[in-house]
Amino acid sequence: MSDMINSDEVNKVIEMIRSLYGENKCITDDNYDKSLAVKCVNGTFVGKKNENIIEYKGIPFVGKQPVGDLRWKAPVDVVPDDGVYEAFYNGKTPCQPMGDLSSAYVQGEDCLYLNVWKAEGDSDKKKPVIVWIYGGAFETGGTVAYDMHNFMKENPDVIVVAIGYRVGFLGFCHLSHLSDGKDFSDAQNLGLLDQIMGLKWVHENIAAFGGDPDNVTIWGESAGAGSCTLLPLIEGSQKYFKRVIAQSGAPGQTRSEEQAIECTDKVMEALGCKTVADLMKVDGEKLATTAGELFGMYQVLGIRTFPERDGKYLPEDIWAAYANGAAKNIEFLHGCNKDEMNAFLAVFGPEVFTEWGKNRLEENLAKFTDEQKELVKSYCRDIGGESYEPYNRVIGQMLFLAPQIRLSEEQTRAGGKSYTYLFTPESTLPLMKSGHAVEVATLFNDPNDTALSGRNFDETYGKILRKMWVQFAKTGNPSLTADISPDGKAYEWPLYDLEDKKVMVLDEFDIHPEKETQRKIVDWDRTYFLTDYYIP
C-alpha cells in the first residue's frame, strides 16, 4: 500500500507520532494543577487538558518493566507509590519489525504503559469504561497510533483507556522446551498476560478517574479483536470486564505448541543461539527484526508469533471452550468487513497476492480430507472475476468471515449473547473495497485519517456507529432508540440466534438486520468447516 500514500504525507505522520513521545518526570514540588491530578495505587498522575478532554499518557501499569532478567517473564504487579508524576507523553512502543508506520515509533522492551481519556468535570455517576487493545497481527502496533480525543469529545459519558502489550517474539515465544527454559513457562502468552495486568490496573484505579470498575468493555480490531475473544478464556480474567467489542478478529488467531516451538527454533537458528541464555544476549530490536523477517504478517511459512493454545492459559481447543460456555457470561458485539482480504490485495498487488494466495491455499489444503479439499476447490471454481479472486474469497472465509459466524454460533449455543455485524462501505482506494481496517478511523471519529478508506464515510453514519458501540458498552445492547439516535431513527439490533441467524448489515445509507443465510456471509456447505482448523 506504500505506493498509494504520498511520501510527504508519510513523513508528516512520522514526525507527528514522534512528537507524542517524551519523558514523564517525577514532580518534586507543589507546582502542578491539582484539578488534573488523579491518585492511583502506584502514584498520583497529572494529565493535560486538551479542549474539554483530560488526557493521561504513559502511566505504567506494572511495578517493573519487562527488561533485563524480566524479559520473557510475566508482568510484575504495581507497588504502592506516594510520588507525583507527569502523564504527558506516551510510553515506549514494544519492539517490532520496522515498517512505514512502526519506523516512527520510539521502541523498547520497557513498554507496559497505558493512556486514559476522560471528559473535564466530575460526575456523581460512575461512567462506563472502554479499554482499547490495538491490533497488528500480534507482531506490531502500539497505543501511540490511536488518539481517542475526538471519540471522547462526542461521547463524554464514557472513559477510554488504551493499554500496551508485548508483541512478536518478545510477547509470544515458547521457551520451556529449551535446556534452560523451565523458568520461562509463561513466555508463550506474555502479550495476553500484559493485557490482563493492564485490565487489573484499570479495575483497581479507574474509579479515581470517575470510571465504573464493574462496567468495563474491552474493544479491539484485528489482533486486538483476537485478544478480546481470547481473554475471556483465561482463568481469572473475567472479573476485569463484562463485554467484548471485536472488529475483524476471532479466537482462531492462535497456534499449537508444536508451531510455537518451530517458530522459536527457526529464530534461534537464524541468530546462532542454542539456549535462552544466548537469546538474552541479543537486543530486543534484533530479536524483533529477525522474527519479523521470518514470520512477518506477509510471509507464507504458516507459522506466526501468535498466542499459543498451551493448555495453561489458553485451552487446547478454543472452539470447544466457547461451546462449553467458557465465555457465556461475557456479552459480545463482533463482526468483520465484507472484503477483508482486499486490504492485503492492495498491499501486495494482484500478481504477488495471487502467488501468495495460491501458496497459502495449497499449504492449508494439505491439512484437509479429500472430501474437504474438493469442497474448497468447488467453492473456488464458482468464483469468477480476476485470477486473484478465488484466493481472495476463500482465504477471507478462512481467516475472517467463517470464524465470526462460528463465534456467534458457539456463544449463542452456550447461552451467551452475541450481536453480530457485517461492515459494507467501500474505500475509494484501488482494490481496497471494504477491506481490513477501513472502518477504524470512522469509529475513532478521525476525519483526517483516510489512509485506508480514501474518503470520509457519511458523517451521520459514523455518528450512528459510534453511538451503537457506546450504547453497547453502557448497556450490553447496541440498539438505538429514536431519542438517542443521531438521525432520529430507531435501530433495533437483534441478538444472533441459531434459527434466524440475523446479523446487522452496516451499510452506509441503510443499516438493517438481515438473515446470514440471505446475505450468504459464509458458505455453510463448503467453507464453514474451515473453522475446525486453526490457520495461523
Predicted features, each with a name:
Residues 367-414, 419-425:
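Alpha/beta-hydrolase fold catalytic core
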Residues 51, 55-79, 346-368, 488-492, ...:
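Short Gly/aromatic-enriched secondary-structure transition segments
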Residues 75, 327-375, 512-536:
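C-terminal, loop-rich substrate-recognition/catalytic regions characterized by aromatic stacking residues
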Residues 95, 401-536:
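Mobile gating loops/cap/lid regions near enzyme active sites that modulate substrate access
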Residues 2-189, 213, 452-465, 476-482, ...:
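Non-catalytic accessory segments of hydrolases
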